[in-house]
Amino acid sequence: MRNLLGKGYTNVDLIIMSASSPALVSATNQKLSVMEKIGYSLGDLAANLIFQTLVTFLAFFYTDVFGIPASEATFIIGTVGLVGAFVFTPLMGILADRTSTRWGKFRPWILWTAIPFGVLSILAFTTPDLTQDQKIVYAYVTYTLLLLIYAANNLPYSALSGVLTSSIEERNSVSAYRFVAVMVAQLIIQVLLLPLALMLGNGDKAAGFHNTMMLFAGMGTLFFLIAFATTKERVLPIVESTNSVIDDLSDCAKNLPWVIMLIVTVLAFITLALRGGITIYYFQNYLSAADLAAFLENIGFNSFIAGLNAVFMGMGF
């Protein structure tokens, strides 16, 4: 492997090769049980209960519930989001690749971040009695820490699907289960979050969002622990490298396909955030609450059905 470093291959290339080449991995094309596939998919359900809430309701929560000016809320979400994409994401990927425990490389991160993820999710939707400037600082700190933990959880979680088995068919099947879990989370957020916030807050928006997030955070933490307990890393990449973190970051910057995918991903998430964040303002300011709930329910239900249909078609049903 070290000889390849002198022949134009970067450390990133070697990692990809080691994770995909039958000659460089130690694993069998093992068929995964339905229990393991469901257990793994619960991790994405857990993450998206929080992520979909952030995308759809965080801006609204900051401005209309916590009382942060719209300009400040936009700046917080935008700047911290970019830091998460361009700093937290690559650093956590490199750190996860250097992890070696009796549980594997990637599974431990799901375990280590399960409780912090839940706690920070609750704190991000908590409204302490602070001055205007203190609220802005509080939002910066909690949102930054939440995105850091999200990266520490979601990067290893996503990589885990590639080391559960070396069977391409089984990996595709796992992805299908995972996609269904994402759509279920999206449906829950779009259909149930606002009614839950009203019910659990007894008309108090701040208490409603806080209590709803406590419910989602508790569910998410439990699902992360189940994902950790029901999965096993079987593909063992063999990569001999003594590169530093700086070297790895340099390799990433020189890897044009990686840079393109990073930019496309960031733009896609910006689009999701804009669409999700603006929708609730439009329907709150121009339509009644009942129309808003019905509209969101229809979107969620239709997307859920379309997503399930696409998955079943892809699986040959």
Where are these regions (language model features)?
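Membrane-embedded alpha-helical bundles of multi-pass transporters/translocases
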Residues: 4, 8, 14-317
